């Protein structure tokens, strides 16, 4: 069996807060099936601990799927049942960065992932 990989495209978006809000994500990740990946979303231009951070998935030709959200003030999380056990959301308040770890990656995880407030 040949070598295969999974491509995760990462995009950040901010809506309805302030025009100077920025969410920065790396452009893409290339990982092997079965592996895990931890992706980041660095926030600036607003009070990081005041807003829920949401994560969303979009596969080619499909609609948006809400993965879950985390509140940076206390790390309270809510997950879409479908992504429980697949995604783990965390934050680092000191760097205003949110993280999403995806485990046991398969071809179904190849998608664009958005962080959003």
From Swiss-Prot:
SUPFAM superfamilies for this protein? Immunoglobulin
**Region (Framework-2) location:** 55-68
Q: Which GO molecular function annotations are given, in alphabetical order?
A: antigen binding
Q: Where is this region: Framework-3?
A: 86-117
User: What are the boundaries of the region Complementarity-determining-2?
Assistant: 69-85
> Could you state one GO biological process linked to this protein?
immunoglobulin mediated immune response
What's the domain of life for this entry?
A: Eukaryota
Q: Which UniProt keywords apply?
A: Adaptive immunity, Disulfide bond, Immunity, Immunoglobulin, Signal
Residues annotated as signal peptide: 1-19
Q: Which cysteines are joined by disulfide bonds?
A: 41-115
Q: Name one Pfam family in it.
A: V-set
- The protein, known as: Ig heavy chain V region 102
UniProt source species: Mus musculus
């Amino acid at each position: 069996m040949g070598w295969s990989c999974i491509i995760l495209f990462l995009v950040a978006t901010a809506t309805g807060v302030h025009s100077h809000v920025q969410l920065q994500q790396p452009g893409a990740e290339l990982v092997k099936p079965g592996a895990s990946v931890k992706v980041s979303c660095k926030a600036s231009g607003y009070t990081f601990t005041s807003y829920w951070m949401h994560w969303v998935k979009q596969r080619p030709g499909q609609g948006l799927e809400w993965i879950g959200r985390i509140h940076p003030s206390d790390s309270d999380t809510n997950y879409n049942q479908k992504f429980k056990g697949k995604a783990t959301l965390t934050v680092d308040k000191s760097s205003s960065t949110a993280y999403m770890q995806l485990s046991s990656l398969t071809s179904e995880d190849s998608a664009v992932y958005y962080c959003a407030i």
